[in-house]
Regions:
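Intrinsically disordered, low-complexity linker/terminal regions across diverse proteins
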Residues: 1-78, 82-180
Length: 180
């Protein structure tokens, strides 16, 4: 296993090095991805949301999924979260074509950065354990994505009759739970 992993790394490095100085091929599949992986991501260099096929099964998605679970999983946890990365601390620096180019009006960008700074300061005060605290600037992009994804899903929920918020939040919590 280790040898195969090392050879894959060498191949990827050689491929990426060969592409230096060339015009980016926006149709080229990112070579670091595995189609069986359970993941989704926003790629700021081509302004795309990518959902790997491994996540398109239970518990993330199944055909008779109640709308509350669907909104919690695909709405908040996956799609809403990933779309918002286009507008987080990193994504905000890239334009429509994926070029590193600040496209925001100066006043909007300053306001955005002021809000991010306020969030970072709040997060910096959270004790993890003993004398270890969260470093807000290390997690702000993911926090923005989580909060925005949740807001998007809740906005959709407002339009649903008899939406069960308890089911929604329980499923959302399960999507975020981990054992360590």
């Amino acid at each position: 296993y280790y040898e195969a992993l090392a050879e894959t790394g060498k191949y990827n490095t050689k491929l990426e090095t060969s592409l230096l100085g060339t015009v980016p091929d926006r149709e080229m599949w990112a070579n670091s991805l595995c189609v069986l992986e359970c993941n989704a991501f926003y790629n700021n260099t081509d302004n795309s949301i990518n959902m790997i096929v491994g996540m398109m099964g239970s518990p993330f998605y199944y055909s008779d999924m109640p709308v509350e679970e669907l909104y919690a999983s695909l709405g908040a946890f996956w799609i809403g979260h990933e779309i918002s990365h286009a507008f987080d601390s990193n994504g905000a620096q890239y334009d429509l074509e994926g070029n590193l180019n600040n496209w925001w009006p100066e006043e909007d960008y300053a306001g955005f950065n002021a809000r991010v700074k306020k969030m970072d300061e709040y997060l910096d005060g959270i004790l993890i354990m003993d004398d270890y605290y969260v470093n807000g600037s290390n997690v702000d992009s993911e926090m923005i994505a989580d909060m925005t994804g949740l807001q998007c899903a809740l906005k959709m929920a407002e339009k649903e009759e008899n939406f069960d918020y308890a089911v929604f939040f329980e499923y959302y919590a399960r999507m975020n739970a981990s054992v360590s």
